[in-house]
Each structure stands twice: as C-alpha cells, then as structure tokens.
Amino acid sequence: PAVIPSEYFNTILYTGDDQTGKSITGVGFQPTFSWIKEMQGTAHHVLHDAARGATAGRISSNRTAVEDATDSMASFNSDGFVVGSSAAYINSNNASIVAWNWKGGGAGSSNTEGSINTTKTSADTDAGFSIMTYTGNATEGATIGHGLTKAPEVVMTKKRDATGGYMVFHIGNTDA
C-alpha cells in the first residue's frame, strides 16, 4: 500500500494560553518526535521525543549536555501532546505556535543490530523515520542499529553527556 504522508508527519498551529495541562490535538496520530516553535519573535525551537521521554525537552540552539526545556511537555497522547508545567517556549500566552510532528514507533526499545547497541530505538519503517538514544564508543566506522529497512538519508545527532552542537548528515551533501 502507498504511504500517506499525513499519517506519519503533520503540522499543527495553535495559540498559547500559558496554562499547564493544555491539550494540543489534531495531529492525527501519537507523535514520537515534536519540533515546536513560536512563530513570532526570538523564542527557541524546542524538541521533544518519546525515546528520551516527552518531558525531556531540548532547546535546539543550546550546546549544553543536559535537557534544558524539561517539563515544557507533560506527555504525548493519541492525537497530539499535553503541555507541561514549564511551558514558556511551547505555550506562551497569546503566542502563535507551530508544532511539526513525526510518528515513529512509540517509546522504543533497545536495538543490537549495530556495533553500538541503542538504549532506545523508535522506528516506523513505513515512514522511514527512526529516533534513538545510544552511548558512543569513539570508534571510527562504528554502526548503530536504526530499525529501518534501508540506510537513513538524513541523520541528526546531539551529544547528551557533553557540551556540543548538533551534527547533521544528508545523503545529498558530498562535502566533508
């Protein structure tokens, strides 16, 4: 059967109200990864995923090792997500907000397919989407089981135990 993109990726627009427990619905599935941003101003991009747990938000521009937007999301639900108690970036009063949502395989489980085992891998082979957590081993050529049926075309990584920025690989980028 053909893949219907809206069953695996959906964008939601909503207006913030600065209230804990606000349900954001209309996604059409339970997200595994949500990238959220106020559309005006200089507010940060905030990333939440099911592999690390919905409450473990990351501000994409920060280089810190720790989760830095914790509790801005309380949970993922069957049609979206619930805003948490520290929602400055994803539910500011009267802010126009966009949430890009991807469907994966839920909270995930360990994966031993590569030379580095993952702690959690949440993959949806129909969508070609996977998100995982793992501990690197500083070995050139190491592989990580991603749960997909073919090699990923886009990869984004971020250290969780040390300061540093994101690294992004795209199949079309042939420059080092």
Predicted features along the sequence, with ranges:
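Surface-exposed molecular-recognition determinants
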Residues: 1-176
